[in-house]
Structures are given as C-alpha cells and as structure tokens.
C-alpha cells in the first residue's frame, strides 16, 4: 500500500498555532465509520454522542519540559539538550545540538549550575546518553529550568505551559502531549460521569517519534517507534465489564488506541494488567480487538496517525471527512479541533 494514498491538501493557515482560550470551545466533527456520514458540533457537546454504559479511555501521561538550554562547563559554548527516554536512575537518552560539541566525558551546566550533566555515551544521529547531577527532586529542577518541546509545526511561543497538558495528566514521561485529551475539562468529565459514561485511564509516554514522517514509499515498510505503556488491574477489569455489558469502548487519542490494541491483541481480545513497550503500527487491513470508536485530532498528511484513523473508519471516509474539514476551515494538528469516530 502506497504512502501517497494518505496525502491531502492542507492550507498552512489551518495549522493551529495556539490553543483556544477555552479547551472545550474546539469544534467537533462526528464521523460515522460505517456510512461516512458527518455531523458538525462543538466539543462541549461531546456528551450528546456518548451513551450510559460506554467507556472513554484517557491517557494520563504528563509532558516533561524536556528541552534544556545550557553550556559546556569547560568553554561556555551553548548547547541544547532534549530528553528522550529515562534509562536508569539519572541517566537519560537525549538529543544534543550541536552534537559535535558534546563528546564522552563532556560536562554540561544548566541554570547557573543548578543542574549539571556528564555525557556517558555517544549514540548515532546526535543522540547522547547523559547522567544528571542535582540537589533535590529531579522533576522539580526540570520544571524550573526546562521548556516544553512543542511540535515542529508550531512556531508560536506557548504562554501557559499547562495548555499543553491534559487536565487529568499525572505521570511524568512524555515528550509530546496526547493531544486528543486537551479538549476535556473537569466539567465535561463530571457531566460524562453523571450520564453514566465510565472513565478509564491508561498511560502511554509519547515519544518524539510520533512526529516522525513516514519516509518509506510503502506503508508496510515503515519502522514504527516504540513507546512505554501501562494498564492497571482496575482499568482492565472495568474495560472487560463494559465489553461484557454491551457498552462501547471509545479511546481518546491514538496513544490510548495503540495501548488498548496492544494489550487486547496479546490476550485474545480481553484486557489485563500490563506494562511494556509497544511499537504496534495500525493501518488499513488491521482488525481492531479493543475499541469501538475514538476521539482524535486532525492529523498530518501521510502520517502514521492518519493511517491508524483510516484503519478504523476507512481511508475514503477519512479523506472525504478531511476534505470537508478543510472546506469548513477546521483547525488542524495538536492545538486544533477534534473528530469523534463512532
């Protein structure tokens, strides 16, 4: 299957550069995956499309302020360090710019020495393993010194970094937000509970690979990045009960979808307490074992994310919906509008 099949024309002006003032003011396109029929709404009315007994599944990961600006202690030369993955203790896999300035043994300093680091290993493509040294709690130091690693297509500064976090974010570890969840407010979550809609949480720490373009010519040749996930026993039990009682499982975002499908595919369509690394790549032809629908944002042309959405709703339905979204000037990507596939 050719990657070109997932291309579409997107005017640059429709790429949302800043979040809306109110989270739930985003528009909501509702797509019927069987018929391709479209309904236009707003996110604050998402409750109207969910039934008592359904379950939405949210990713409670929290984005790290993972971009650090510092200097080499020896020369004062400026360096930028992007945290990718915690290895062991205070050792992290990072991306360093300019990489040539940082060799094994190089000592770096951030925030007037409040945080220092030594390079322990050189990796390919500008990657470096770095061991941090600090006083106190690492994540508190990082909160005070780090900046949010916004996606490459967002050029504006983010005034309020909490707007790149979901209201239910808890577990530190992501390099990017699970953006479908950015539309939810505490009021919407309360209203869903009041209606009898179950709310379940999983964790998947989003890696920067989520922004990596599909460079292969054929979809099947794409090498999917791996991300860490976990599901609690409580969530697994709830999802199994919802399934047994005939409710729908609606994942919020591609990250929740990939977590649920990873676990269900390994346990014959059922859910269990689990954690590990997933590199599941979902594209048309995939048979879903976990979800009945999903809430997601509007994705980049030819991305692995639009392929996942097409696997659920059908490529032609999705591309037709995206053309309609462009015509109606929906906002695209991380700070953009939402789609409910049901």
Curated annotation (Swiss-Prot):
Family listed: Belongs to the QueA family.
Record gene name: queA
Biological pathway: tRNA modification; tRNA-queuosine biosynthesis
Organism of this sequence: Bacillus licheniformis (strain ATCC 14580 / DSM 13 / JCM 2505 / CCUG 7422 / NBRC 12200 / NCIMB 9375 / NCTC 10341 / NRRL NRS-1264 / Gibson 46)
Recorded GO CC terms: cytoplasm
UniProt protein name: S-adenosylmethionine:tRNA ribosyltransferase-isomerase
GO annotation (BP), single: tRNA wobble guanine modification
Subunit structure: Monomer.
Principal localisation: cytoplasm
The entry's keywords: Cytoplasm, Queuosine biosynthesis, S-adenosyl-L-methionine, Transferase
Reaction it catalyzes: 7-aminomethyl-7-carbaguanosine(34) in tRNA + S-adenosyl-L-methionine = epoxyqueuosine(34) in tRNA + adenine + L-methionine + 2 H(+)
Xref: Pfam families: Queuosine_synth
One Gene Ontology MF term: S-adenosylmethionine:tRNA ribosyltransferase-isomerase activity
Role, per record: Transfers and isomerizes the ribose moiety from AdoMet to the 7-aminomethyl group of 7-deazaguanine (preQ1-tRNA) to give epoxyqueuosine (oQ-tRNA).
Leader sequence segment: none
Enzyme Commission code(s) on record: 2.4.99.17
UniProt subcellular location: Cytoplasm
NCBIfam families in the record: PRK00147.1, queA
Gene3D superfamilies the UniProt entry points to: QueA-like
């Amino acid at each position: 299957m050719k990657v070109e099949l997932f291309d579409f024309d997107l005017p640059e002006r429709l790429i949302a550069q800043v979040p809306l003032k109110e989270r739930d003011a985003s528009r909501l396109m509702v797509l019927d995956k069987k018929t391709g029929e479209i309904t236009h709404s707003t996110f604050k009315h998402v409750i109207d499309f969910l039934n008592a007994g359904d379950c939405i599944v949210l990713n409670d990961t929290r984005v790290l302020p993972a971009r650090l600006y510092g200097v080499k202690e020896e020369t004062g030369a400026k360096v930028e360090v992007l945290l990718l993955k915690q290895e062991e203790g205070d050792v992290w896999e990072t991306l360093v710019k300019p990489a040539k300035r940082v060799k094994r043994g190089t000592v770096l300093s951030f925030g007037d020495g409040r945080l220092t680091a030594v390079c322990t290993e050189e990796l390919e493509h500008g990657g470096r393993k770095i061991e941090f040294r600090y006083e106190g709690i690492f994540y508190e130091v990082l909160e005070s010194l780090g900046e949010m690693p916004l996606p490459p297509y967002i050029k504006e500064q983010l005034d309020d970094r909490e707007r790149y976090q979901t209201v239910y974010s808890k577990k530190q570890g992501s390099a990017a937000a699970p953006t479908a969840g950015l539309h939810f407010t505490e009021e919407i979550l309360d209203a869903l509970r009041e209606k009898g809609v179950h709310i379940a949480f999983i964790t998947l720490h989003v890696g920067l690979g989520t922004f990596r373009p599909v460079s292969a010519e054929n979809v099947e040749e794409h090498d999917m990045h791996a991300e860490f996930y976990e599901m609690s026993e409580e969530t697994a039990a709830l999802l199994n009960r919802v399934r047994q009682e005939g409710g729908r499982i609606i994942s919020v975002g591609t990250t929740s979808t990939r977590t649920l499908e990873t676990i269900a595919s390994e346990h014959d369509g059922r859910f269990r307490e689990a954690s590990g690394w997933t590199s599941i790549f979902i594209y048309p032809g995939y048979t879903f074992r976990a979800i009945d629908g999903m809430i997601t944002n509007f994705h980049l042309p030819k991305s692995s994310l639009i392929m996942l959405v097409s696997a659920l709703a059908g490529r032609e339905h999705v591309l037709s919906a995206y053309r309609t979204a462009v015509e109606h000037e929906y906002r695209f990507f991380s700070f953009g509008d939402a789609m409910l596939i049901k």
